[in-house]
Amino acid sequence: MNTNFVVNEYALVWYLLFQASISEPIYKIKQRLWDAFKDKYNNMFNDKLLILEDYKNFIPNDDTIYNIFFESKEYQKIRKQVEKYRLEVMRIWDKNKKVTQKLYSNIIREKVDEFTFFVVSKELNIIDNPIKEKAIIGIEIDKKDTTEYLLRLNMVLVMNSIKKYNEEDNDFKNDIVELAILNEYASNLNDRSCYLNGTPSLMELKRWIYPYWLMYLGIPKDELLSRMMRDKIAFELDNYAYEKELVKMNLEEFIDFCIRNKRYIIREQKVTKQEINKFQQMDEVPEEII
């Protein structure tokens, strides 16, 4: 997997111009440029996709505003900060390369040949993925715990690699990608279960998918109970036939399987929400769930 982290000056200026101002000096530069070159400023809006599609060869139709921005002291200061930030991002990525490679070989089961992250100021607080295989990253890094940052990078990568689904089925895609990144991958990074993390509105769907997800991961039938205990997600084992073919699928195929079989997966379960809440705080599995 070839993942690149680059600073492209045109992309950096574009996001500084068209996102919320990150400082008073930047706001003043933008206001001055708007007052002096309103038409040119408006025309630059369409440059974003052109820059990202062919960033190595991009030449603006009109470079007036870009050049003024490049020459400003405030931009030079930000440019140095962004390069320092880029090196920090690369250090986090490289440090976790082995466990990330396992994510793609064992969990996603799909190669990401090449992906480019355009690094911008973290003061912009942005993750943007406007075109395939390219994304903008500019968010704070928690120095004490870089795991969250790594998870967000990989959410972008995996979401980008999977086809689009219709609105009705999109929750299945989002939920299963969360299972892969925010739950299984995060558990591997932290050496503890992270299966209660994720979008609250998707938790009920996640509980329905979870037994099949364990089969997809290749967890043996006689270990399902211990995984249920570890992850604190209750389901009735006797209600599920063990689907041996799931372990042969990649993530996108598993999403398709769940969508095709959703009327069987989303079933009435005897385990109530009250029992689940109680179960999540227990150290032993109650017999009625076994």
Where would I find each of the regions flagged by the language model?
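Long, hydrophobic/aromatic-enriched structural stretches that serve as scaffold segments
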Residues: L50-V82
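Catalytic glutamate of the conserved HExxH
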Residues: Y149-K164, A180, E184
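Pan-zinc metallopeptidase signature
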Residues: T199-I290
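Short, charged/polar micro-motifs that form catalytic or ligand-binding hotspots
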Residues: R86-D94, K143-K144, D171-D175
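Auxiliary, metal-adjacent structural segments of Zn-dependent hydrolase domains
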Residues: K73-A135, D191-Y195
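Short pre-active-site segment immediately N-terminal to the catalytic Zn-binding motif
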Residues: I137-L153, E167-F172
